[in-house]
Amino acid sequence: MSDDTVGFGVIGLGMGAGRARLATQTAGARLVAVADLDEERGRKASEEHGINWYDDYRRLLDREDIDVIMVMTPSGAHGDFTIEAAKAGKHVISTKPIDVSLERADDMITACREAGVILAVDFEARYMADNVRVKQAVDEGRLGKMVLGEARLKWYRGHDYYEGWHGTWKYDGGGSLINQSIHQIDMLVWLMG
């Protein structure tokens, strides 16, 4: 690379549209290109950021100026994209959860390890200001020794939320437990140690 920035490619422009935008606002990061099957979303991102859009994610993997692939697809598809990106020598940031099956998660970890690339899972709740303050208080011992943690989730979404891939076993895995409660589970692990 001719500069010191890290080149990003984003697969999936549902929630990934926001992550693509963040890549353009992050020091040291450079959004290079995006991939999505939906032409409207692809063209919108391309025009907004002045980058290439592809309807075939493999075009991202072929680019030498992309260092990191952000996988922002339905949860049950994370494995395939991650493994292909690793084989292409790209580091991977996958949105949560890592995948809907432990076997696929293990396959992703193995593929990245064998390729010598980094695999990270995006748990954005860790970066919310209130959560950061609680973590600092825990780490500094201001709350005493943490011995028990509890999380609760009230969850309601209208029927239209579940008309696509959400709520399917293949792509959503376990409904609100895995797709939404994963944040609470991660917070317990992060805060409790």
Stretches found by the model and what they are:
Residues A33, V68, L148:
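Short, Asp-centered acidic motifs that coordinate Mg2+ and/or phosphate
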Residues G42, F81, M108, R133-V134:
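Aromatic/hydrophobic pocket-lining residues that form π-stacking "cages" and hydrophobic walls in ligand
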Residues M1-H49:
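N-terminal Rossmann-like dinucleotide-binding module
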Residues A125-G193:
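Predominantly a Rossmann-like dinucleotide-binding segment in NAD(P)-dependent oxidoreductases
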Residues V6, D106-A125, L143-A151:
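Rossmann-fold dehydrogenase core element
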Residues R19, H78, H183:
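Histidine-centered divalent metal-coordination motifs
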Residues H49-A111:
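Beta-loop-alpha module in the N-terminal Rossmann-like domain of NAD(P)-dependent dehydrogenases
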Residues T26-G28, R63-E64, M128:
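Acidic-histidine catalytic/liganding microenvironments
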